[in-house]
Every structure is written in C-alpha cells, then in structure tokens.
Amino acid sequence: MMANQGTLLEKGKADSVDTDSLEIDVESLTHMESQLNTDSKTRQFSVTAAINSIKISERTKLRAKIAVSVVLFASLFLFGKVDLSKSIEVALKANPWYLLAAFALFLGSTFLNAYRWKLLASAAGLNQSLLKMVQFCFVGVFFNLFLPSTVGGDFSRCYYLSKGTGKYAHAFYSVLADRTVGIAVLFLFASLGILLGPGGGGLPIQLKLPILLGTVGIFSVLPFLPSLAKRFLGPENWVSRQLNNSPASIYWHDRGLMATAIGLSVILQLIFVLCHVAVGLALGLTNIPLWYYFVFYPSVAVLGFITPSFNGIGIREWAYTYFLTLAGVDRAPALTYAIMWLGLTTMSSLVGGLVYVLGHFKISKAEKDLMESGRMDSLN
C-alpha cells in the first residue's frame, strides 16, 4: 500500500510538473505572439511612415501635367504630320455663326448641369438655390483650366456647397454622383453609336471593345454596388460602410432621383453632341455622319478626364485628330477642330472667372492650403 501511495505521489508530482510546464509554455506562446504583433505593427508603421514620407509637391504635379500636355501637343506636329499653316487657314474660313451657336449651347449646358447637381445635392441634405449652383459650376470650370492643382473644379464645388454646413462628405458624394452619372451616359452614347451607327461595325476593335465592355460593366455593376460590396467584402468593411451607411446610400435607394438624373444627363450629352456638330459645320466638315459624333465625342471626353495632363490639353487634341481622320477628315482641319473646341472651353472658363471675381468667391490662402492638404473638414 505504501508502494502504491508512493507511486501515486510520484504521478502527482509528474502531473504537477506537466501543468507547470504547460503554464510556462502558454506564457511563452503569449509572449511570442505579443512580440510578433509588436514587430508586425512596427513594420507596418515603418512602411506607412515611409509611404507618407514620399510626398510630391503640388508644383511638381502641375509641372508634370504641363509637360505631358506640351509633349502630346508638340508630337502632333512632329509625328502626326499636321501642317500648322493649313490648320490656321481652315480656322480663318470658319463660319462664325455656327461657332457662336456652339458657344451658346455650351454655356447653356451649365444651367442644366447645375440643376442635375442641385437634385443630387438636395437628396444628400444640402439645399442651395439654382442660381448658386450655376455659379458654383461656372467657378468649377474656371478652376479646372486656370487653377489646375488639387484645388480643381470638383474640389471647389465641394468646398462652396458645404461651406458653413459641416457636411463636406455630403457635398463630396453629390459631386461624385454627378460625375458618375455623366460618365455612365457618355459610355452609353458611345456604345449606341457603335451598335446603331451604319458604320459602327467598321471601327477598329481596339476602340470598340473598351467602350462596349466599359458600358456593360458600368450598367451591370454600379446599380448593385452596395449589395455586392456587402456580400464580397463584408458589412463591416470600410467600402461597404461607405456605400451602405453613408450619405451616398441615398443614390441607390432613391431610384426616381437617379432616373431623373440619368434623363437630365442624356439631354445634357445631346447638347454637347450638338455643340460638336456645330463646330464641324463651322469648319465645313459636312462629311461626318451624325452617329459618329455619338462615338468620338464621349471617347475623347473620357480620355481627357482619366489622362494625367493639364486639363486634358494635348490628349484631347490627339484624340480628336485620331477620331476625325478615321472618318476621312484631313489632319489639318481635324487639328483645327480640336483647337476650336479648346477655344470654346477656354471662353467658358473665362466666364467662370468673371463669376469667381464678381461673385466674391475668392479663396483665402489659409483655405487653399487646407484644401491642398486634404483637411477639407477643417474648412467648415
């Protein structure tokens, strides 16, 4: 019996030792895990700090954009075989009445654009008069061309709409929705031109494919984006929360609002197509079929929007020349067409400049610095 007790005692000691060892192992593992987490956070912080330390000044960004525009514009003459003297000759023979009509239509489109944006902003809880929204749009056009830093047209629209309200996020989402609806209709127009135009099938596949795929992607994914984000990213994901629980969610819930916005966008883009037709008629380019305007104008607009350049200058001239020569237009009048369109946008920007000065929309240096640093909420 004593032997059995001794055996049990020894077993108990062994179990005690094993338990102690287990506790030591758990503590060691916990310490190791903590150390690994600390090291991971340290490395993550170091990487983040390194990324944040890489800052490109606004002046450098602006110089880079100007350089891109200058190179693209100059390459038209160096490699595009464009005779500048012929382009000037075509410009001097332009019909001024058609150009005046194009300019009037272009200016008038700003009022419709402002009304569309007003509807989207009101849904997000930001109510301004139509006159104010028109002024904000004109000032935005001015900022796009003459102040092409981070304080661009869209930033300025967000700033003026939210000023004094503390609702910069609401303003941002309204501008983003305004942009998105416009781009969606641009893709739709280009696709309809390709599919329904008599010569759409003869266009290069490298032109047709991105337009058609982009249109399918926009109209098949965008309407269901919040639910798709929740399903694939999870409800707690930042993107899911922004789409489902932020002021932006109204644009998926109010289908009547978005149908109205899309309808206004269709009318707006039709006006821009008419502007392009008027410029073509002013230059005597009567051989361009109407359906083709629905293809090349949206394509040029999207390229000018996504390409890093000085307000799209350079890339637009290349694009206009490319698309018009595809339609059988000589290079010289094609370039003249591009320059005429640049002149239209520049004159509209000058009108925006008058609104900016006479409407007392000047931004102080302190406000400009905050906008460029991204601390927009501090402005309200």
List each model region and its residues:
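Membrane-interface alpha-helices at helix entry/exit sites of multi-pass transporters
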Residues: 130-135, 149, 153-154, 164-179, ...
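Predominantly cytoplasmic-facing regulatory/coupling regions of multi-pass membrane proteins
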Residues: 2-138, 196-305, 333-338, 343-380
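Hydrophobic alpha-helical transmembrane segments in multi-pass integral membrane proteins
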Residues: 308-310, 321-342
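Hydrophobic alpha-helical membrane segments of integral membrane proteins
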Residues: 156-160, 172-175, 185-187, 310
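Re-entrant/interfacial helical elements at transmembrane boundaries that shape
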Residues: 153-162, 309-326
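Transmembrane alpha-helix interface/packing and boundary motifs in multi-pass membrane proteins
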Residues: 141-149, 298-317
